[in-house]
């Protein structure tokens, strides 16, 4: 993958928070990560990104970056995903990304089971399953304003609106 085709770059300029120079620098970084020169980053390559492998949600993050569900992250998906974490990414973009981490089946809702799975990944063995299920049940009950037993994006957003989630989803990196 030499210089990124201008049509792709033009689309990324329109759809992301990066300028042309930033996209070019990120393209070079992408090419270094793509060790086998396949044009995409597989799970092992994705996990080699500094700070990613130590994140318990790294697998889910990669799945959210992988918009076409191919199992790999191509250049457009890489830039689009990183754009959300840039300082220019909006709070709404960051919250939508966080929501997608929990929405494993991509149906637009966070179910009790999905919330349990993601929280289990995060807390590991620090809580037993019964304690964790109580937290999940309480979280759903307290935030499910329409009573359908699951959280929509708006319910999720309202639940964490007062937290500093958007700030914690901003990466400081040298582009």
From Swiss-Prot:
Keyword Repeat included in the entry's annotation: yes
GO CC annotation: calcineurin complex
Binding positions (Ca(2+) 3): 103, 105, 107, 114
Amino-acid positions noted as binding Ca(2+) 4 in the UniProt annotation, renumbered to this chain: 144, 146, 148, 150, 155
Claim: Glycosyltransferase is one of the keywords in the record: no
Alphabetical list of Gene3D superfamilies matching this protein: EF-hand
GO terms (BP aspect): calcineurin-mediated signaling; cellular response to pheromone; conjugation with cellular fusion; intracellular monoatomic ion homeostasis; positive regulation of DNA-templated transcription; regulation of cell morphogenesis
Keywords: Calcium, Lipoprotein, Metal-binding, Myristate, Repeat
Positions of the EF-hand domain: 21-56, 60-88, 90-125, 131-166
Annotated binding of Ca(2+) 1, by residue: 34, 36, 38, 40, 45
Miscellaneous information on this protein: This protein has four functional calcium-binding sites.
Cited function: Regulatory subunit of calcineurin, a calcium-dependent, calmodulin stimulated protein phosphatase. Confers calcium sensitivity.
Family: Belongs to the calcineurin regulatory subunit family.
UniProt-recorded name of the protein: Calcineurin subunit B
Species the sequence originates in: Saccharomyces cerevisiae (strain ATCC 204508 / S288c) (Baker's yeast)
């Amino acid at each position: 993958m030499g210089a990124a085709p201008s049509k792709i770059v033009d689309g990324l300029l329109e759809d992301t928070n990066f300028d042309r120079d930033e996209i070019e620098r990120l393209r070079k970084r992408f090419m270094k990560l793509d060790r086998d020169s396949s044009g995409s980053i597989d799970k092992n390559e994705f996990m080699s990104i500094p700070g990613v492998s130590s994140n318990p949600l790294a697998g889910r993050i990669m799945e959210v970056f992988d918009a076409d569900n191919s199992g790999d992250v191509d250049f457009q998906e890489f830039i689009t995903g990183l754009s959300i974490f840039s300082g220019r990414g909006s709070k709404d973009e960051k919250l939508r990304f966080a929501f997608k981490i929990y929405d494993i089946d991509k149906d637009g809702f966070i179910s009790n089971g999905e919330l349990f799975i993601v929280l289990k990944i995060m807390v590991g063995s620090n809580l037993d399953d019964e304690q964790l299920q109580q937290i999940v049940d309480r979280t759903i009950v307290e935030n499910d304003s329409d009573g359908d037993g699951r959280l929509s994006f708006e319910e999720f957003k309202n639940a964490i609106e007062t937290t500093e989630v958007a700030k914690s989803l901003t990466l400081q990196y040298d582009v």
